[in-house]
Amino acid sequence: MALQGWRFFGVSATIIIYIGGVLFLSMNNIPGSHPKRPRIERFAEFPSFHSPRFPMPSRKMTIRWCRDLKYINRDLPIYADYKSDFYTALPSDVSAALQSLPALTALASFPGSGNTWLRYLLQQATGILTGSIYKDYGLLKTGFPAENVCNSSVLLVKTHEWGSKAWAPFSKAILLVRDPEKAIIAEFNRQSGGHIGFASPDRYKRTKGKYWQQFVSNKLKGWEMMNLSWARNFTGSIKVVFYDDLVHHTERELRSILDFLQFPINEQLMRCAIMRKEGIFRRKKRLLSFDPYTESMRAEVQNRRRIVYGLLGRQEP
């Protein structure tokens, strides 16, 4: 009898525990019965990280071209790898085709001088693709499908190189020159944040500022060598364009460049190019809360600029 009583008690306890558990779970699942768990934001320290105003790098940027872009001559085989293919013996029919095309023109500049922006303007004003001795995948996907094309099927070819081997493919050149103080910062931004991004303030202060100081010293020498070697030693026709003139007198400079290239001006395309001149490849201004140049650095930059500008026939203001 006692055994049956214990069995009855055990079964009853099990049923009570089961019913209690069901009621507890039901109450916790009723909407509004408990506060919502706060949402954890990724990259919360960057409130605009996912904002449409600041597109993710992987998002494809689209450009409204004034006209569909094309090659000057689609029938010409594209020998795209400059370093490995340009100096090899080409088939006779390709060599003949190259010789029958207009002279190959370089768009030479020190990095950070506005080369990409000028290419963008010229593609808008002509509808013709521009090439490059490099293969920048970022540019390849965002408006420059002829990256790494280095022959006269394109309007001109971008280069940041100098010296006899760099000059060899070209019979004409446009030398784009920018104030070294601004060009060096633009190149520092490009290496840190891409073609339209910026370097964080912390990058200027790496290794207690020694990294930035060495960067300026190296790039200033490169800026001087790049501009003077092309201006003095290139044996073909050369036109010097100053970035500041391109910014303040865009249409005048574009017309002058197209005249140098002996490319007919389409007035409708020119108006369209000027209307869309900003594009996405001209880095917007950003004011730093500090001056990255020390007094001695700025004095050296200004001295080199004065010497180079004087040799290029540019009068300092």
From Swiss-Prot:
Gene3D superfamilies: P-loop containing nucleotide triphosphate hydrolases. Changing residue 148 to R: In strain: ZBMEL157. It is a single-pass membrane protein. Glycans are attached at residues 151, 227, 233. Keywords: Glycoprotein, Membrane, Transmembrane, Transmembrane helix. It comes from the Eukaryota. It is found in: Membrane. The keyword Glycoprotein applies. One of its GO terms (cellular component) is membrane. Changing residue 218 to I: In strain: ZBMEL186. Pfam families: Sulfotransfer_3. InterPro entries: P-loop_NTPase, Sialate-O-sulfotransferase. The keyword GTP-binding does not apply. The chain crosses the membrane at residues 8-28. Signal peptide: none annotated. PANTHER family: WSCD FAMILY MEMBER CG9164 (PTHR45964:SF5). Belongs to the WSCD family. This is WSCD family member CG9164. It comes from Drosophila melanogaster. The lineage of its organism: Eukaryota, Metazoa, Ecdysozoa, Arthropoda, Hexapoda.
